[in-house]
Amino acid sequence: MSAKPQIAAFPKGWIKDLVAPDKLSIYEWIDMAGAMEIPGLEMYNNFHDFKDPANWPKIRRYVEAAGMTIPMMCCSPDFTIPDPELRQQQVDHEIHSIRMSAELGAKLCRVLSG
């Protein structure tokens, strides 16, 4: 028997605040999402609190302590950049994002087009 689909929340309305330093911390958003009583949180790779890899295990533990998981990481690299060096930077950042996804326990790393 396969697992039933689960619901995960994505903070669409708070992306700008979660990307900016000193606006909304990932921990504050996790607490807000916990009130929805959902099993999962979809994350975005450019949230400010994800910049330091030392934060990844702490964030994962915080999510799990709240009774949730991170089933998917959302990323938006731009592989269409004509300049080879800049395009390689995007590839390298995506590799970094895949590593971050694994560290956070995400089973999927979704790549948005662009």
Model features per residue range: what roles?
Residues 112-114:
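Flexible, glycine-rich active-site loops centered on histidine and acidic residues
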Residues 1-108:
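N-terminal pre-domain/capping segments
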